[in-house]
């Protein structure tokens, strides 16, 4: 092998098109959001230059047919916190929206939201004290196993 071939750097592949940027989803199940999760979600959205969706999933009762027909917008305290998160994200320079959905199975419905909205990162952010340590781990594991995107936090 000649020195001319050995000293030449290999040609680096060049991407023809940019990678698609997909939004960040901050999720809670009708429980106040964790402060660290809020900061992480806003930071991830700013760093990637993508939209932040602040999502509240409400569980509908299935035992009573009349109750299942009633949709609600969630706990008013949590709704106020969602407005504050959206305001914080916009003040920091990120685009932000609220998303509320009702389902008898909110975790299963989440996978449809992730697919339909083409979410790139789910930040699972309910307050762990209110939500419960074991339930948090179980739901995080299920979301991580079935979601078509990245899921944060990495550890429960």
Report residues per predicted region.
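Short helix-loop-beta junction
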Residues: 47-48, 85-95
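Structural beta-alpha unit
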Residues: 1-19, 91-122, 141
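Glycine-rich, Arg-bearing micro-motifs that act as flexible, cationic patches
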Residues: 124-145
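Small/aliphatic-rich secondary-structure junction motif
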Residues: 15-68, 72, 97, 146
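Structural motif
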Residues: 27-31, 125-129, 156
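A short acidic, glycine-rich active-site loop
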Residues: 71-80
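Short, flexible loop segments at boundaries between secondary-structure elements
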Residues: 144-156
